[in-house]
């Protein structure tokens, strides 16, 4: 059936059918997007055959793998996702490692449970003809382990360690120990699926046993280190994920010294075809390429202003001035830098910037929709680390010669609904006001702001693209990254030419909004002196004493992009005069003072009970049960979801601020989330198997 099946152009003004072998649309020239998806459930391997077209849309390319031949159309989604599927949705903040649910194919027979759920992984390795390089989408960790460098191998293990606690909280950590689920997508560790933990959930001893099997084919200069590390894990001497992460961080810093990194940065901005003035801003200054040698720390920022009476332009420029001043990009040679230390620096700078804009709003008596604010994306590199920070819906993409991954998750209503487990992402973005922001810089106090700062490891040539939605809307990056940005990595174009080409593309293909772009091009070469093998005892001695002084409590933790979702007001419905980029007030954390007050109250209550007991007087008051916290209702139809009840009421957040220059609601993210690793779980997180399903 391949010979007669066509691939639809994703350009909404074209939608022409094309041969499956085409790379570009024959009619409009748009690069054709090939989305390969994984069908959940082993039963589909025998029920559907290669070459078969399912639901007049999904072409079976391999057992359990289909190609979406109509990528411009929204996939089907149920009114309410089944409860077992919510694990994937709630793990959206970890989309670089865990697949997201693309959609589903309803059962052809209502009497049988034969619904097919589809998973997407971002960029999949393809050959020049657009066909799969690996017959099961991605290679297993074991398949490619022996071919990787020492730094890449430590990098993969570090990613597994970082995922341990988040997956443990969801009772799917056994996924990391399943060799068939633990896959690799270039530099990223990705899970093919999630699998449920058994009654006896795995612990770090099991992780140590899994890693022991990798030692014989590990890079020679990390084998001794891994032997000692796995022995400590299996013996139980190393029993905390944070200690394991710290040791691997030390190893990353050590082996990262075996490479030198230089950077080129280029920024550009344009008003667009439909706007009268430009409310975007960026850093460094536009239209001049900047080269940074090894040891210099690059900083790039893009802001997209929001607010009436030219307030957005003021907010964006104020953010650029403050952040570039607060963050010191000077070299840090001969200074010992601890892992994640710059995360705190960046987050603090973002909070300072937020309060300066908020105070400006208050000084100018800006209320409700006249308050000004701005989105933010920022990239800052230190040694082998790239820190990616964001607030709002501007985006960062991580591009290599073979992959493009969206690093950030938009701070909008659509993403919020997904993280709450209510809607599939590609369904959520179809709703009115789906692109309304849930937070932006300057709308209220920094106490209500939750910036996301992620730490990425650079071990190969790559490009970080920072952009406002003037470029990213309508999946333009997903369509054009390979043809427009990869030539930079091949040495066929320079960074200036690529930046100018992307800006021109934004105006030609979108043009509805201001467009701003920052390119951070990183070149990686071997260091003049190779690194010596790391001695495990050295890493442990340097790291563990510091960690033993800390008491870790993960009960209230949030992770990159994961928000406290108990106080997000819902904006009013969109109207002809209200932009989709309305910005509701930010999230609210419980004040530390409230926590202290509660603790003091509990201690006082215990003291009173003790006194009554000693006095032989029975307690006169009944036990106190806290009232349950009301959760938000699922979004259905076109009605925005009800706001979640704040557990700490008392402050009324300001009304949403609207961008006075109406834009368009962004479509699906340019790249779907990327998967991670796995273990042999007892039961996969899937729906029930169809009863005796057989093909006609």
Regions found by a protein language model. Name each.
Residues 629-690:
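Long, intrinsically disordered low-complexity tandem-repeat segments
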Residues 55-56, 203-204:
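Eukaryotic nuclear, charge-biased low-complexity tracts
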């Amino acid at each position: 059936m391949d010979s007669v099946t066509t691939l639809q152009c994703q350009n909404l003004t074209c939608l022409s059918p094309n041969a499956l072998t085409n790379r570009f649309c024959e009619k409009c020239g748009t690069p054709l997007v090939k989305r390969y998806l994984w069908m959940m459930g082993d039963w589909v391997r025998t029920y559907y055959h290669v070459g078969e077209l399912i639901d007049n849309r999904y072409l079976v390319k391999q057992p359990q793998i289909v190609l979406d031949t109509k990528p411009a159309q929204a996939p089907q989604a149920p009114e309410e996702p089944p409860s077992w599927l919510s694990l994937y949705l709630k793990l959206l903040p970890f989309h670089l490692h865990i697949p997201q649910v693309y959609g589903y194919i309803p059962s052809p027979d209502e009497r049988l449970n034969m619904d097919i759920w589809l998973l997407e992984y971002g960029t999949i390795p393809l050959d020049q003809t657009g066909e799969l390089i690996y017959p099961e989408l991605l290679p297993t960790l074991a398949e490619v382990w022996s071919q990787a460098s020492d730094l890449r191998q430590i990098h993969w293990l570090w990613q597994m360690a970082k995922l341990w606690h988040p997956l443990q909280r969801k009772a799917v950590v056994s996924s990391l120990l399943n060799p068939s689920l633990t896959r690799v997508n270039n530099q990223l560790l990705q899970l093919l699926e999630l699998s449920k933990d058994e009654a006896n959930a795995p612990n770090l001893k099991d992780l140590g046993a899994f890693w022991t099997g990798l030692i014989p084919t590990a890079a020679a200069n990390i084998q001794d280190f891994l032997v000692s590390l796995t022995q400590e894990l299996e013996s139980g001497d190393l029993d905390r994920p944070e200690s394991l992460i710290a040791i691997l961080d030390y190893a990353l810093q050590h082996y990262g010294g075996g490479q030198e990194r230089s950077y080129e940065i280029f920024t550009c901005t344009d008003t667009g075809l439909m706007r009268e003035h430009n409310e975007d801003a960026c850093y460094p200054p536009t239209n001049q390429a900047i080269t940074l040698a090894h040891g210099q720390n690059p900083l790039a920022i893009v802001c997209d202003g929001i607010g009436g009476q030219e307030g957005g332009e003021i907010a964006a420029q104020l953010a650029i001035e403050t952040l570039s001043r607060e963050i010191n990009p000077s070299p840090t040679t001969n200074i010992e830098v601890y892992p994640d230390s710059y995360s705190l620096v960046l987050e603090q700078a973002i909070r300072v910037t937020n309060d300066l804009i908020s105070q400006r709003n208050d000084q100018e008596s800006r209320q409700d929709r006249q308050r000004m604010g701005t989105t933010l994306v920022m990239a800052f590199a230190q040694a082998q680390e790239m820190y990616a920070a964001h607030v709002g819906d501007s985006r960062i993409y991580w591009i290599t010669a073979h992959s493009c991954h969206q690093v950030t998750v938009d701070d909008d209503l659509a993403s919020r609904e997904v993280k709450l487990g209510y809607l599939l992402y590609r369904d959520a973005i179809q709703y009115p006001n789906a692109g309304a922001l849930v937070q932006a810089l300057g709308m209220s106090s920094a106490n209500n702001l939750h910036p996301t700062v992620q730490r990425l490891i650079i071990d190969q040539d790559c490009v970080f693209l920072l952009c406002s939605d003037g470029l990213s809307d309508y999946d333009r990056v997903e369509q054009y990254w390979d043809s427009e940005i990869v030539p930079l990595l091949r040495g066929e174009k320079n960074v200036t030419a690529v930046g100018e080409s992307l800006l021109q593309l934004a105006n030609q293909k979108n043009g509805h909004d201001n467009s701003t772009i920052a390119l951070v091009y990183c070149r990686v070469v071997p260091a003049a002196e190779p690194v010596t093998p790391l001695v495990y005892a050295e890493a442990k001695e340097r790291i563990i004493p510091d960690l033993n002084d800390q008491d870790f409590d993960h009960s209230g933790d949030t992770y990159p992009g994961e928000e406290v979702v108990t106080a997000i007001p819902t904006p009013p419905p969109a109207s002809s005069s209200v932009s989709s980029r309305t910005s509701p007030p930010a999230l609210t954390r419980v004040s530390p003072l409230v926590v202290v007050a509660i603790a003091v109250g509990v201690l006082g209550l215990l003291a009173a009970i003790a006194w009554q007991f000693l006095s032989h007087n029975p307690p006169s008051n009944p036990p106190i049960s806290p009232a349950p916290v009301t959760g938000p209702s699922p979004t259905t139809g076109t009605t925005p979801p009800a706001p979640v009840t704040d557990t700490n009421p008392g402050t009324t957040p300001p009304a949403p601020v609207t961008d006075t220059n109406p834009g368009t609601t962004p479509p699906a993210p340019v790249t779907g989330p990327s998967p991670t690793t796995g273990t042999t779980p007892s039961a996969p997180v899937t729906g029930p198997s169809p009863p005796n399903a057989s093909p006609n």
